[in-house]
Amino acid sequence: MDSVSNLKSTNFQNNNDPKESVEEAVLRYVGVDLKNHIKKTKKKLKKQKKRKHGSKMSHEDEDTDMDWYLKTSGSKDLRKVDDIEPNSVAVAAVAAAYNSSMREKDKRSCHKKSSNSRSERKKHRKRKSSKERKAKIKMVLDPQLTTLDDGITTTAFLPDDLIAETAFDKYVDTEKAYLAKHPSKSLEVNEDDKENNFNNNSSTLVRIYTDLEGIPNDGSYIKRTPKIPEKDVKSDDLILAPEENNGDTALLRSDIVKASVIDGAITKSIGKKFTPSEENALDQFIEEYMKIRGLDRRQMCERIWSTDGVIRDGFWANISKVLPYRTRSSIYKHIRRKYHIFEQRGKWTPEEDQELARLCLEKEGHWTEVGKLLGRMPEDCRDRWRNYMKCGSKRGSKRWSKEEEELLTTVVNEMIEEAHQYQRMKALEAANKNDRYNQMYSRGPKGKRISDNPTFKDMINWTVVSERMSGTRSRIQCRYKWNKLVTDEAARSMLSIPVSERKWLLERLKQLPKTSYSNIDWNSIATYKPGYPRTGLELRLCYEQMREKIHDFKGRSTAEIIDSLLEQIN
């Protein structure tokens, strides 16, 4: 109403002011030169005559021109400009200008709303990514020692010999209860499940287990293992806090680049002992970190063992780049063992054994708490209890008898058969379910995926093996003995290997880069020839048997040994 009244007052002033022309009124109120506008209109009329009928104007022409007013009602023809009263033209100009300003205001309002919606979506994505980042940081940076507790094991930092949470001895009784409790819960497929199978690096005395990944259905003890992919990590992907973008950042970056090219970086180090060069690379990184942060050794150890989750400066993410071919889990456990905060390490006293036994009666499995009470590393408490004290006085320390070896073989084969039966049962039940339920049913409690191709570690829980041996042998005794039995059997099978296979093996070894001789991937060699019946363990034992025939082979390099063996065969 205000705009209409203003428009009327404008017309009234134009009619009663003889000194002011229509052009001046239009120019004064809307900033439009009417003469120039009329000229433009005439030119436009001429152009429209040349165009085809029915052409449409853009929205901008409709908003800024007065052609809409020049049209007669019910007709598409334009009236002549001279036939229109000047005051009416002024009114049309004012109305057009007002309409244009309102349209611009509407556009700005719509743009503001759309920008607000975009900003809301951006904020939502930011909040979502922040939550995901916090969840990752909670797992990656300063992961707690709950990996040692049997009840709350995390897959990211699972100890290699802690196999209590396997698919076969835990899932059978608990999965249906979990699905009954959460019938509508949809478990998303985690793309990192494949990588989690390789996070269990060997950190115990037995290293041969890297060659014993699986057992076939025919009951034999050996199976070829899949090739383990290397970590695809670039040294440039440093995660540094914002305040660290200075000269210290360049120093850390240079150390990581230097350490990434050490001998053995192109080979697999899964389950292998840290070499002196790797130790030096990690120590150098920590020394530089201490200088940058102004920390002494004690403070650095407390930083490494901190579990409050507050410190988020990318320490664990950056130090894992120092050895990019090793998993973060192995580096994490190795650093914590070396830079520990506990006073006691090494030999256990009888008093400590008694205290450990007393604590395990109440807190067995909660090794973080047990370690704090005893002032020892949680891993030490766990291993001491499971490997030496759990069996008590029943644990035998003498040479294994033939009956014990047969019982151990029987127990292991029974567990392997139980694992295969479980897999067949799962496959049969999953075939009768719909796709959505299949996805849920292929997982155990807490959403952990059950592998379609279970490995030997998935099948065998050495604590259960010790219990089925009536506790006469500890879990580590059973594990050691089984490794020896398998190795002896593989060595016997290699005594009759043909000369052609020996020659093929030596030629394959000769083709390898000399830098990889210190860490040969035997499983990769075994899978090189399709349908080859030998395993990586068998090939390694075959090479070691041939190597022993060379005098003073310990003083020769691997390349020299291979050349000498090829000369003997040829």
Swiss-Prot record:
The modification Phosphothreonine is found at T64. One of its GO terms (cellular component) is nucleus. It holds the Pfam family Myb_DNA-bind_6. Residues 37-56, 108-137 have a biased composition (Basic residues). The keyword Nucleus applies. Residues 1-16 have a biased composition (Polar residues). Residues 340-391 form the HTH myb-type domain. Residues 1-21, 37-68, 100-138 are annotated as: Disordered. Present with 432 molecules/cell in log phase SD medium. This is RNA polymerase I termination factor. It comes from Saccharomyces cerevisiae (strain ATCC 204508 / S288c) (Baker's yeast). The gene is NSI1.
